[in-house]
């Protein structure tokens, strides 16, 4: 599992969407059904938050942190994706059409 587009993400069921941005950014705006676990909290305590039997999609503003996190967790046996577009591109595409 790896990068995923927002359109493909919308087609999937039983996936946990995790916003890894800071709490303030999440509070200002986030994807529907997303929960917030900031990057540094998650990377330092992933086993506390995640279950290897579940599927996750991470996103951040530009996808750099979410991609590195997803790659690391996939190597450890977790099932994860990251949002290719990043949240800022998603937001621009949704609000400027």
Q: Which residues does each PLM region occupy?
A:
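Rhodanese-like catalytic fold shared by cysteine-dependent sulfurtransferases
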Residues: 1-7, 12-15, 22-55, 61-97
């Amino acid at each position: 599992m790896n990068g995923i587009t927002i359109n493909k993400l919308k087609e999937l069921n039983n996936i946990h969407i995790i916003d890894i941005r800071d709490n303030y950014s999440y509070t200002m705006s986030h994807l529907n059904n997303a929960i917030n676990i900031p990057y540094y909290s998650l990377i330092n305590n992933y086993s506390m938050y995640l279950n290897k039997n579940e599927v996750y999609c991470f996103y951040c503003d530009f996808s750099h942190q979410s991609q590195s996190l997803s790659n690391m967790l996939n190597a450890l046996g977790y099932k994860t994706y990251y949002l290719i577009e990043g949240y800022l591109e998603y937001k621009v595409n949704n609000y400027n059409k």
